[in-house]
Amino acid sequence: MNRQSWLLNLSLLKTHPAFRAVFLARFISIVSLGLLGVAVPVQIQMMTHSTWQVGLSVTLTGGAMFIGLMVGGVLADRYERKKVILLARGTCGIGFIGLCVNALLPEPSLLAIYLLGLWDGFFASLGVTALLAATPALVGRENLMQAGAITMLTVRLGSVISPMLGGILLASGGVAWNYGLAAAGTFITLLPLLTLPRLPVPPQPRENPFIALLAAFRFLLASPLIGGIALLGGLVTMASAVRVLYPALAMSWQMSAAQIGLLYAAIPLGAAIGALTSGQLAHSVRPGLIMLVSTVGSFLAVGLFAIMPIWIAGVICLALFGWLSAISSLLQYTLLQTQTPENMLGRMNGLWTAQNVTGDAIGAALLGGLGAMMTPVASASVSGFGLVIIGLLLLLVLGELRRFRQTPPVSDAG
């Protein structure tokens, strides 16, 4: 990586064929899952005219994802990771085919949608954990920051493209097209993934899966460094749940429908800028301190967001949150991968990803509770400034993370 450039170096895609294969598979997978994410709520709403039923499907899928992350972490530390990745992707695609067939029936089954949502949520997250655990072996630990930034860009780009494509397909061909293309995309991802090298796990004693997962929890709690990283990740994810207040805040700012879309686009845009300008981040000597400061700064941006007098200033605050949270997330990912023993990478990646899922749900619930007691402006500000106070306390308490120093890696990617 060029030490003189703040811009992200994409040369890793050229020099590491295995990572390039993962990049292609991940992008296609994100677009496929995005098509699914648009189709399922629309189909359930059309069938039931009940927002509660739509919410139930999201909750069930989220629960299945959480279990899949836990199980996937154990499997990724026990079995050859390439096999786990391929099995999870292929099985997930079968579920998409089931949704497509169900949508083509004269009377689609609501129960089938719920059950297949559980199926796909479980196997999709199972494969994600194994892929995360395999990344250090694919790119080398010295290139993890660069790989993480490229992955973040992939996710953001795919998350923008897939809802737009999904909406066009719904308008022109109905939900069956979304499901069918999602299934096709998922099976297409198997082609680049088949080119991956074998990804064996370190030898370790066989033990009960629950005991293996408990060992990961003990490691997390016993390590001030890894535990602090996981805690910060959960808090940042909680802060991002402020999006549940966008519709109410948009009314107070008297925003048009088109302008409301800018609120939803601001955080992904800021995160993309953060990833694009992360070229020097891997060479920081004190990544823990930068992580803590950027996290507190992101909370401050959320606190200021709602009290801005005009909506444009609010959008700028959200973009700032996206940028700072991207810096924090990239450092979390890199330190987690480099400081976790190889034989625990699967389980720790599963726990770290799971806290993102649960943190978002907890944040949304807390904001909903605050919204019942105070105005949307007050709810967003109280949550943001409350997290600032917690962040400042953690800046003092997490001494090992704050003082952590590393030797800047010498990348062979560029």
Swiss-Prot record:
Its main location: membrane. The gene is entS. Keywords: Cell inner membrane, Cell membrane, Membrane, Transmembrane, Transmembrane helix, Transport. It is a multi-pass membrane protein. It is found in: Cell inner membrane. Belongs to the major facilitator superfamily. EntS (TC 2.A.1.38) family. The chain crosses the membrane at residues 22-42, 56-76, 84-104, 110-130, 157-177, 179-199, 219-239, 257-277, 288-307, 314-336, 357-377, 379-399. This is Enterobactin exporter EntS. GO terms for molecular function: enterobactin transmembrane transporter activity. GO terms for cellular component: plasma membrane. Residues 43-55, 105-109, 178, 240-256, 308-313, 378 are periplasmic. Disulfide bonds: none annotated. Component of an export pathway for enterobactin. HAMAP family: MFS_EntS (MF_01436). PROSITE patterns: MFS (PS50850). It comes from Salmonella typhi. InterPro entries: Enterobactin_exp_EntS, MFS_dom, MFS_trans_sf, TM_effector. SUPFAM superfamilies: MFS general substrate transporter. Residues 1-21, 77-83, 131-156, 200-218, 278-287, 337-356, 400-414 are cytoplasmic.
